[in-house]
Regions:
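Cyclophilin-like peptidyl-prolyl cis-trans isomerases
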Residues: 2-220
Length: 220
């Protein structure tokens, strides 16, 4: 009787232990093949955050109104960096648009009100081959006959000036590095002022058109 009792007990214990092992193995397999079920946290994939395109802009406060320029740092990185450097240093403050031609462009950034040239930094490489065109409302670097001679002076086109665009290395063009996004009507007004010859330079406004300040700002 005793031996049968222990035999039955051992059988019951064996069955219980086997059942527990099966259950444990089942749990482990479920957790290993479905790691996200336990907490639910890993099942939620994070959406990639949208990268905001921040454009650098410069506001020219002039004696005839404000002009806001959006800079194309992607197409003209060297030129934009150069322009921002001058603006942040206050170089353009109290300079003038010293060359104004109606139906063509306005040029400034290098002379004081009394027509004295400011000493610039070293010249930069010409980025005119960047695909940007000298269309109405664009800003580009002025230079001498040497393509890589641009320093501080710039011009804003009042009309499409295709003849200023890059064609090939032998016709290198003028480097566009931004466009007017506000105040093009101010540019148009500036082109209507009376001009004269001063200090050997033609097309100088009789009444100075002053760049009071050039401030770097950013917009989305």
């Amino acid at each position: 009787m005793v031996s049968r009792f222990w035999l039955k007990l051992n059988i019951v214990v064996f069955i219980l232990i086997s059942a527990m092992c099966v259950a444990l193995i089942g749990c482990n397999e479920e957790n290993s093949t479905n790691p996200d079920i336990k907490t639910g946290e890993k099942m939620v994939s994070e959406e990639p955050q949208e990268v905001q395109d921040i454009k650098k802009t410069v506001k020219l406060e002039t004696s005839m109104g404000d002009i806001i320029i959006e800079l194309d740092e992607q197409k003209a990185p060297v030129t934009v960096k150069n322009f921002i450097r001058y603006a942040e240093e206050g170089f353009y403050d109290e300079t003038i648009f010293h060359r104004v031609i109606s139906g063509f462009m306005i040029q400034g950034g290098g002379f004081t009100v009394d027509i004295k040239q400011k000493p610039p930094h070293a010249p930069i490489v010409n980025e005119a081959g960047n695909g940007l065109k000298n269309d109405r409302g664009t800003i580009a670097m002025a230079r001498t006959n040497d393509p890589d001679s641009a320093t501080c002076q710039f011009f804003i086109s009042q009309k499409d000036n295709d003849f200023l665009n890059y064609i090939k290395d032998s016709n290198p063009g003028y480097a566009v590095f931004g466009k007017i996004i506000e105040g093009m009507e101010i540019v148009d007004t500036i082109t209507t002022v009376k001009t004269t010859t001063k200090n050997g330079m033609r097309d100088v406004p009789v009444e100075p058109v002053v760049i009071k300040s050039a401030k770097v700002i950013s917009v989305k």
